[in-house]
Amino acid sequence: MKTGIKKVKLHVKKNDSVVVISGNDKGKEGKILKVFPIKSRVIVEGVNIRKRHMRPTQGQTQGSIIEREFPIHSSNVKKS
């Protein structure tokens, strides 16, 4: 009996140039920064940018709001 997580093969990989084919960022192009094969999601440069609220730490006494890319489903992109 096998245990563990099944490896999922995606049609794109890190550093591929892709175009978003559906969603709010449809038509945007970018390079893949990171791939999450288990969840079938990818992070594309300049796509799906959201604001993230950062908590104050010992190094920074004040919190901040930063903008960064969040993952989108791999079926929403195609190689260009």
Curated annotation (Swiss-Prot):
Q: Which keywords, in A-to-Z order, does the entry hold? A: Ribonucleoprotein, Ribosomal protein, RNA-binding, rRNA-binding
Name the Gene Ontology biological process terms: translation
Sample GO molecular function, one term: structural constituent of ribosome
SMART domains the UniProt entry points to: KOW
Q: Which Pfam families match?
A: KOW, ribosomal_L24
Transport in keyword set: no
Gene Ontology cellular-component terms for this entry are: ribonucleoprotein complex; ribosome
**Is the keyword Chaperone in the record?**
no
Give the start-end ranges of region Disordered.
Answer: 53-80
Under the heading InterPro entries, the entry gives: KOW, Rib_uL2_dom2, Ribosomal_uL24, Ribosomal_uL24_CS, Ribosomal_uL24_KOW, Translation_prot_SH3-like_sf
Alphabetical list of Gene3D superfamilies matching this protein: 2.30.30.30
So what family is this one in? Belongs to the universal ribosomal protein uL24 family.
Q: What does this protein do?
A: One of two assembly initiator proteins, it binds directly to the 5'-end of the 23S rRNA, where it nucleates assembly of the 50S subunit. One of the proteins that surrounds the polypeptide exit tunnel on the outside of the subunit.
HAMAP family linked to this entry = Ribosomal_uL24_B (MF_01326_B)
The protein's assembly and partners: Part of the 50S ribosomal subunit.
> This protein is called what?
Large ribosomal subunit protein uL24
Organism annotation: Pelodictyon phaeoclathratiforme (strain DSM 5477 / BU-1)
Q: What is the lineage of its organism?
A: Bacteria, Pseudomonadati, Chlorobiota, Chlorobiia, Chlorobiales
